[in-house]
Amino acid sequence: MSNLKQHKQALFCNDNEAINDYETAMHNAVQAVSAWLKNEKMYTGGSIKQMRALISGFNPTKEGMGVQKSLDHLVEIFLNPSLKVHHPHSLAHLHCPTMVTSQIAEVLINATNQSMDSWDQSPAGSIMEEHLINWLRQKAGYGEGTSGVFTSGGTQSNLMGVLLARDWAIANHWKNEDGSEWSVQRDGIPAEAMQKVKVICSENAHFSVQKNMAMMGMGFQSVVTVPSNANAQMDLIALKQTLAQLKADGKITACIVATAGTTDAGAIDDLKAIRKLADEYQAWLHVDAAWGGALLLSKDYRYFLDGIELTDSITLDFHKHFFQTISCGAFLLKDPENYRFIDYKADYLNSEYDEAHGVPNLVAKSLQTTRRFDALKLWFTLEALGEDLYASMIDHGVKLTKEVEQYINDTPDLEMLVPSQFASVLFRVVPKDYPAEFIDALNQNVADELFARGEANIGVTKVGDKQSLKMTTLSPIATLENVKALLTQVLTEANRIKDDIKNGTYTPPID
């Protein structure tokens, strides 16, 4: 016989005792998070070896330990050693501090557990998402409409962009015997197209372009990368030459993927110029604005995105410079007719009958079926804070970056590697008279040492053949004084370990 009382206590439901238990557990969870926030250390977990020792396995029992005891355990092994992304020294990645409104929205999203694949599973959310997509389209210059959908993030949105572009290009270049356009959805990819159809992006584009084309069966060989200029933007001369060469070789450029905010340098490609070339070669233009799309709300830097309205599709991520909790992204499509390449009717979800009666059909716009109502986070934030405060928070990081760049240029033993553009600083430590062959190792280990001690999270990447440190200065609460203090730590740490590295007596903290 089932124990319904225990079932109700375990389930989120309208049982009075279950509601009381929920309120108590949520209160305790919030208290634990508040205590974690008050600990000013950025990270307390130590090295990877220390973390593996702390989390040595997963061994649930048949009886269970109870909610409170399990919560206490999770505070110990998960919450306390988690990275504090709001800390002003947590600057390694596009990993943002989050809005309070986003945190509150998560409670509502989780409590209601709506699914966006059909209107009857999310009656309010489906309509709200359509309105928010319409608002985003107008911000981007696409005009009114609902052609777009919320996604899990940039990789999925980029997949939608290159997928639709490929199928659009094949429909334009391959025909059936009766003269109708070829449908990849119905008939698969023509054998000839596997070698002919290409996608172009810059060498600094997100790796998801290659990854997605491989998942689509086209392989890495279908992606042609072009060099970047000194500012890490797509080189327009190289792009024009690449387009011409591909055409001369009998290839078809299905899509040019531009970037508005490269992962490392924050570079924003010249969208207007790329649009002209895309038109000349009849190519789709997709822009990966996962990061730079935040400038749609900017007061001072919106012009960085001039030309975004000319693209065919756009990737946006709200869990980057929009300060929303992970995950929250969107894909915008200019021409709704191009959704035909992925449209599918399932009678139990999006029947033609429902569509004829004005029922929202979001599943036809998405690669996902079951999908969270993540749009609520952005809706709540915009409605609560307003566009002016949002713009101020977005612009803060861009202004801070310029100040940090000037400080680095004025500081001995520090060197900028790429001029700052958006909210990223690529630099390195170069001690005077230090042997060049040890510079890369020095910078790598400075970052590793500071992270292992919980003092800073600085990114490590490559600029050409040089090992670079990276600070993603998007935090709306970080100050120049915070960054100066961090750079002082960087120089102090470099001075501490540089001789041991040179002499071969240094042991990296990651070992």
Swiss-Prot record:
GO BP annotations listed: carboxylic acid metabolic process
CDD domains per record: DOPA_deC_like (cd06450)
The protein's annotated pathway: Amine and polyamine biosynthesis; 1,3-diaminopropane biosynthesis; 1,3-diaminopropane from L-aspartate 4-semialdehyde: step 2/2
PROSITE patterns (alphabetical): DDC_GAD_HDC_YDC
Any one GO CC term of the record: cytoplasm
GO function terms (MF aspect): carboxy-lyase activity; diaminobutyrate decarboxylase activity; pyridoxal phosphate binding
Cofactor needs: pyridoxal 5'-phosphate
Pfam families: Pyridoxal_deC (PF00282)
Gene3D superfamilies: Aspartate Aminotransferase, domain 1, Type I PLP-dependent aspartate aminotransferase-like (Major domain)
Keywords: Decarboxylase, Lyase, Pyridoxal phosphate
Keyword Lyase annotated: yes
Superkingdom assignment: Bacteria
InterPro entries (UniProt xref): PyrdxlP-dep_de-COase, PyrdxlP-dep_Trfase, PyrdxlP-dep_Trfase_major, PyrdxlP-dep_Trfase_small, Pyridoxal-P_BS
Enzyme Commission number: 4.1.1.86
Modified residues (N6-(pyridoxal phosphate)lysine): 320
EC class: lyase
Entry's family note: Belongs to the group II decarboxylase family.
Record-given protein name: L-2,4-diaminobutyrate decarboxylase
Origin species: Haemophilus influenzae (strain ATCC 51907 / DSM 11121 / KW20 / Rd)
Encoding gene, per UniProt annotation: ddc
